Amino acid sequence: MSSATSDRMTRQELRAGLSLASIFALRMLGLFLILPVFAVAAGKLPGGDNLTLVGIALGIYGLTQAALQLPFGMASDRYGRKRVIVIGLLIFAAGSFIAAAAPDIYWTIFGRALQGAGAISAAVTALAADLTREQHRTKVMALIGSSIGLMFALSLVAAPALNAVIGLSGIFILTGLLALVYFGSIVVLQQ
């Protein structure tokens, strides 16, 4: 292989990097999209006037995600990266749909906990490492990492507009549907 050829990412590496960055971005979108609107929108839910419960609903996502990163990472080593990512996306989607249909703040907390329980970050980055050559791994990891900042900025702008059009339940439904779309993209990646 010539030096010029090895200096460039292959089509498969680029596709894997973009797909995995998109999946990671979805997770960040699920976390960030409700932040600008949740405290106000939650006030319409029974129990949503309790600021402690609103804070728990916001924070439980990150708590369950952090608690389950290591177990999901170990499961991806044992059962395969794609399988764990698919399961995580399905758990995330289920949590999104439960939060969308939540009749009160307690069900919202449960839905958000499930969203966070689909802890796929470790499996996504491990799969990125598996699918790229060493000299291109940093580029793919940077692409995945940049999705965090991009989703945060996008969420701050899009969330109020989305909330005005589809409401908080619609935002949860949207993130659940996106998880199902990305479920398809992970299936087509090489392993």
Language model features with spans:
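Short amphipathic helix-loop junctions that connect adjacent transmembrane helices
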Residues: P36-L51
